[in-house]
Amino acid sequence: MHWSEKIAKDIIKRSPDKEEYVCAAGISPSGSIHIGNFRDIATSYFVYKALIKQGKKARLLFSWDEFDRFRKVPVNVKEIAPELENEIGKPYVDVKDPYGCCSSYAEHFEKEFEASLSRFGVEVDFRRQSENYRSGKYAKYIIQAVQKRKEIFDILDKFRQQVATEEEREAYYPVSIYCPVCGKDETTIISSSEDGVTCEYTCTVSYTHLRAHETDQYLV
């Protein structure tokens, strides 16, 4: 028995009454997808196919984490677009395409990977996280995270080796903010409203001191 069939059987045994089983994978479009990234979707794909083989309705969901921070310029990209160093800190979806053929850095490498999957005959339900964030789909969850930030800190602190200070606990926020002035996440939240709807923050790049509301598109 293939390992994916065993996992599929275990899933069905655990949740036998599901109308549809959803297998999920996801990565950031940080550059050309290598074999390590491909393993993530391949694992979910084999389980998805095993579920279908056993007569179950299943779907393969793939999340493009394109609202993640652009952390570094890959060596092969730096050779043709060294100026992208200036865009580190922005979400991938807001970084320009170094090859000039797509609307963004994210779209370029997403299309490259999606074309490869298509050649292999892999059918995927793609989701783009920038659309979910900017549509406000996650707003209520972000508010909850801000409201319960100290509880979240306490949970994480249980797994730390060093003792946390009360100052660290007080300053902790489980969210990041992309500055609407410079577009980067070089921000520090300094306070929030009691209901978690508004955060006050500063940006080290644009030297701004602003407030972010839960409906804003740059809260993540």
Please tell me what each predicted stretch does.
Residues 196-206:
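Cysteine-rich micro-motifs
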